[in-house]
Amino acid sequence: KAVLIDQENKPIAQGSHTWENQLVDGLWTYSIEAIWSGLQDCYADLRTNVKNAYGIEIETLAAIGVSAMMHGYMPFNKKEEILVPFRTWRNTNTGRAAAALSELFVYNIPLRWSISHLYQAILDNEAHVNEIDFLTTLAGYVHWQITGEKVLGIGDASGMLPIDPTTNNYSAEMVAKFDKLIASKEYSWKLQDILPKVLSAGKNAGVLTPEGSKKLDASGHLKAGIPVCPPEGDAGTGMVATNAVKQRTGNVSAGTSSFLSLIHISEPTRL
């Protein structure tokens, strides 16, 4: 969905596109082609609705933001080629990895988190792992392609690897434990090297590039240079949209899956 809001944050137009995930080789995925054709169709629908409602063409905007499904696995090599088809949050083949990491980190690591997908690929001795240059989520991927910036909003990043609330970055302790865990593999990378840079809300996350504008607007009317905010996951976006942003608040999301998001007073501890 593409939503256009005014200066008072009220929706004034929208566009949409319907897509379905595919089960390929036992794993749920969306193709790269489906991602971009869907985004272009969605933006084109928004553009048409704006022209019909207001008689104007969209050429520039105050800002753009990308939100998408959290978690999953999108590894890329140095040539910016995806190494395996996008593995979405729906995949449950990561049981061994999630259990092992939960014990190692003394922290609950769900099946869907990116670190679970990465470690499962390592446990399965998948050949592509040594070639990884960048690992990101769907929102992080789209943002990277339209701005050139390998960054991720702190909410979406927390679904890749736990965040240390004192540093607003990935847990240094967990990063070190993971690197030690896989040291015998002698991969060409360390974990911190391949993860997106973590950004808090409001931080500079780049601008729409000329190439990025063409990826969104096939008609060529959308101009480059528009600021783009840190890309976020659907859960964090939903919490902001429902004003669940303070401690002791939360919200429930019900759609493809159902989950409760809460803001704790302090870091939960294991009894």
Describe each model-derived feature in a short phrase.
Residues 1-32, 81-88:
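Short glycine-rich, Thr/Ser-proximal phosphate-binding strand/loop in the N-terminal lobe
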Residues 26-29, 41-266, 270:
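Glycine-rich phosphate-binding/catalytic subdomain of phosphoryl-transfer
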Residues 34, 38:
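Charged catalytic carboxylate motif
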